[in-house]
Structures are given as structure tokens and as C-alpha cells.
């Protein structure tokens, strides 16, 4: 059968495999590429190259494939620490995840940890692949494991009863044996992902937001703020709000400029200069955002899920304690904040991944799922994500 020409007109969805070590995440990833993409062997995926995201080195493998209705970008990480870092830095944003669980073992510590992390960093949907079912003779055992997985997902606020659980053997699918638990299970899995994980709203369809990178004044014209539009669209003549650091204030965009050309509008992904009415040179600064009025609020207190770098990764050499005061780098600027550790935690070691509360000295335009780096004098010592806004 001739492969259909690769068309970019299908909606795009980012997903990834998560789950306990050795439960078959990488084998499953390879098996999916065999039936839906350009086949990538296990060792091509396992020898993932290192990348840097927010000053942190992460090994991640990227594969792409497509179903009849969608194009998928899929991430798989070789090691557990890579998963933690990947999910927290958002290096590979996931619109949904495939949770791989070995039918013989059932949920294990990292299964739990990845589900919790998924909840904290805002992975909205999960589909389960129960792997290695050929290693379990008793069908009742498989049912028990399925119940256990559903209960575990429900305990972390995922809809455990509704989540599709596909049973199969990724290895059989790779080797082209035992079609029912091999190839058929992979096809059933992708069908479930197609149906259960919704297509995310495209960046241009979301409310406008642009982090301010630089500000300058043009004599006779006014103040221009430059940056890369994170999401949405801005049109000349629209009202915008300046949020963060100081009290919010409104302005009107009187011009959009890109590569020295005047445009009617700018959209997500564009690097633009926005001409602002009635704002003087000191009225706006790097670290603030321009956004659709009322769409984002400034906050100073939040709960974070964070990963603290090891010494080998260029992080701290020593632990930190309660009332630690580093800088939190949001989008384009550092803001000092104080860390409040959870009860029962005395100190945090380099290499730890934990949840704590932060109070910033100045407000930042903040939403849940916003990523940040933790820095000391310009050096990255950790990465985090806003898991909950407190005030």
C-alpha cells in the first residue's frame, strides 16, 4: 500500500510516553512509528540526544507520525530524571500523554510519580497502554491491574473510569507477531488517542499576550515595546493592558511593526514592535506583558512544582533551607522571591523535585502552567512551573 503523501494540513498534537522504568515506553514508541510513521528502531530512540531547556540539559527523543486525522509529535525520554525535567521545564509541551504500565507489575512508584507530575504541570489528558499482557496468564489479574490503574488515575483527579485502557504487547507489534495483541493494539491505541485527546486551541486563537523584551521611544511617534507574541492576535487600534511589576494600566496599540514594515496586525510567533498610545518611555518595562485587557492578572504568591539542578548540571553544591531567596525568571525578567517549604521538609538537596510555595517581591502576569527558571546571580539553579495561584 502506498503511503499517503505527508501533508501538513492535519491538526497537530503533541504527546509523549510516560510511566515506570522498563515498562516498555521506548518499545511502544518504536512500535507506533512502525505502523504510523517512519520506522525508528529502539536504539535510535533510546540513544536520545541531549538538549538544553531553561539552562537544563535533558535527553529527549522526538518522533513524528500521523493517523488519518492528525499529525503527532511524540516525545520519549530515556531516564526518569529526564522525564521530571522535561515535564517541569515544559521543554516538550504535552497536550496529552500515553501512560505505559506493565501488566505483570501493575502501577509502580514512577507510574504514580509521572501521573502526579502530569497533574501538577497540567497535562490535561491521558490514555493508558497496558503492555506485556502476553506475560500474564490469568485474565483476572489483568482486570485487577486495570482497576488499580483506574483508581490511581482517579486519586490524582484524572477521570479514571473514562480513560481508555488499551491492552497489548509493544514487542509483539515491533516484531510483527501475534497480530491481535501486537499490531491491532497499536492501531487501537492511536484510535483512542485520536478520539480521547482533544486538539488543542491553536496559539492564534487564544487571548493576546506578548512579553515585553525591550522598550524605546520614537520621537514624534511615541513609545514602542518589542517582543515575540506568545499567543493571540493584535490589531491596530485595539485596547491592550500592561500587566506585571507595577499596577496594571490600559493603552491602545496604534501601530504594529515587523522587520521595519508596518502591518495591520501581529500574531502568535511574530517578533514585533507595538506602538503604544499615551505611554511614556518609563511607563512600561521589560518583564511586563501586553495582553488582552482582563485576560491575565498579576500575582505574587503561588505554589510551584520545581526541579533543583545537581552540582554536575551546573546547579548548587549545597542544599537550601526555608526562606531561601533566589530570583525567579519569568518570561523575560528576574523577580526575587522567598521559598516556603512544605511541612516536614527541612532542606532541599540538589537533584530534588518537590512542591513549595513562593512569595515574590513584585507581581508578575501569571497563570497556572507558567514556566520559570530559578536563578542565583544569573546562574540557573532550578526550573519550575506554577501549579496553583494563591494570591
From Swiss-Prot:
Amino-acid positions noted as binding GTP in the UniProt annotation, renumbered to this chain: 19-26, 76-80, 131-134
Keywords, in A-Z order: Cytoplasm, Elongation factor, GTP-binding, Hydrolase, Magnesium, Metal-binding, Nucleotide-binding, Protein biosynthesis
Annotated region described as G1, given as residue ranges: 19-26
Region ranges (G4): 131-134
GO molecular function, one term: GTPase activity
Enzyme Commission identifier(s): 3.6.5.3
CC annotations in GO: cytoplasm
Substrates-to-products reaction catalysed: GTP + H2O = GDP + phosphate + H(+)
Cysteine disulfide links: none
Superkingdom of this protein's organism: Bacteria
InterPro entries noted in UniProt: EF-Tu_GTP-bd, EF-Tu_GTPase, EFTu-like_2, EFTU_2, G_TR_CS, P-loop_NTPase, Small_GTP-bd, T_Tr_GTP-bd_dom
Residue ranges, annotated region (G2): 55-59
Region called G5, residue ranges: 169-171
Residues that bind Mg(2+): 26
Chief subcellular location: cytoplasm
Residues annotated as domain tr-type G: 10-201
One Pfam family matching this protein: GTP_EFTU_D3
Subcellular localization(s) per the UniProt record: Cytoplasm
Region (G3): 76-79
UniProt similarity note: Belongs to the TRAFAC class translation factor GTPase superfamily. Classic translation factor GTPase family. EF-Tu/EF-1A subfamily.
Self-association and partners: Monomer.
Job of this protein: GTP hydrolase that promotes the GTP-dependent binding of aminoacyl-tRNA to the A-site of ribosomes during protein biosynthesis.
Name of this protein: Elongation factor Tu
Gene (name only): tuf1
